Amino acid sequence: MTGGDISPLPRENFPMQACIIGRNSPRLLKIFLYLICLLSISSSAFAEELDLQLLIDAALRNNREMLAAQSRVGAYTYRIPQAGSLPDPMFTFGYQNDTLSSYTYGQSPDSKWIFELSQTFPFAGKRGLREEMAKADAESQKAAYEALQRRVISKVSENYYDLFFAYKSLDIIGDRKALFSSMEEAALARYSSGMASQQDAIMAQAEKYMLQEKEEMLRQKIQTLEGMLNLFVGRDTSLPLGRPSAAREARLYETLGELVKKAYDRSPEIRAKEKMIAGAEAKVNMSKKEYFPDVTLNAGTDQRGGDYTNMYKLTASINLPVFFSTRQEPAVKEAQAQLLETKHELEATKLMISSSIRENFAMAASAQRLMALYRNALIPKSTQDYEAALTAYSNGKADALTVVTRLKALIEYEVLYWNQFSERQKAIARIGAYTGDLAQ
């Protein structure tokens, strides 16, 4: 298949002669050619029929945005032990001499080697709060990753059904072009017998050419959709895909209220915001802990040498939060404001999810009703009208415009039927991204 060809190659076009390996061929060459044949056949099978589940599986494995999010989750997870760890201890060493002119170690009581070790201990509870904040951030990223998974599945499903609809539209237009050809033949027959003007045949030809224009536009749309699907599954966007297999009709069995409740219970977006709130609450508590000082313990020895006794010391130092009005108090207010912001974001997320589910539920229900209308009433009636108009035109009892109008209406209703089918499938996929009931 070339880059510009969107239709899958028929099985008979594959160079199967290349798969015939002579007995005198070297062993390695035989193995190599055999593998090439297997890859060619498997690739052609993938190109002939496109399965939604295979696309979803490929996207979950290879989508670049998801791989980046997965690495981000790992990075945040590694922050947890860092946040709960003690600061590194400090080792200090040096030498103090009595004069600048000579080395007086062991000769003067003021000459000595100094060795000290110090360790800072945060005030009780600070390390636990820092670890709690880091853990909440990591869990929020995990929930965000799950939400991204669902969005990717939903987007793959949406583009898949758009591609399905584009191919269905091509089928309809291809079939109906034959009907315009029949009308053209009837118009030419009537024109040759003097029963109609040449304008009737020209009208049929013009409509047929307009359908060819739509075919070309659909082929361009198919290439665009294939590029989008390749992007989601992590493949080269120029690679062709096959035709979507027969789509399984999705159904909604819950009421609107049940779907909204399920989304609230299962939505990773909501869970991510809840984890962010937990982290913000820990930050508020942490900022309040900053009013209390940390303690630094220092142990050291002065080695004086000679007849002088060595000296040992143990000290403790604390930081004094004397500038609390410009440091600790604003920090507490900042953390409280961020907590309030996160709570508002949670409520906004719930409203957004509820609104989106309501919108897509209405779209799915409307599409279901319209499909029934097209399938049971408009398409059968339009088919009868077209057949009656064509028969009447052949008998000289109707004009060409009537036949063209009836046929265009039939094409429009058939395309609209499959458009509503595609829109319903996409709406249900979007709902599934919130509830977790994704059609895979």
Q: Which residues does each predicted region cover?
A:
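Small/polar-residue-enriched beta-strand and adjacent coil segments characteristic
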Residues: 89-147, 271-349
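Periplasmic alpha-helical coiled-coil/stalk elements that build and connect Gram-negative outer-membrane
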Residues: 30-31, 148-262, 266, 360-363, ...
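Amphipathic alpha-helical coiled-coil segments
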Residues: 68-80, 148, 152-173, 182, ...
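N-terminal secretory signal peptides that target proteins for export/translocation
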Residues: 1-28
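Bacterial Sec-pathway N-terminal export signals of envelope proteins
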Residues: 46-95, 102, 120-121, 129, ...
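Aromatic (phenylalanine/tyrosine) cluster motif
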Residues: 14, 32-34, 46
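Bacterial N-terminal signal peptides
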Residues: 30-42
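Short, charged, amphipathic alpha-helical segments
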Residues: 132-135, 198-206, 400-408
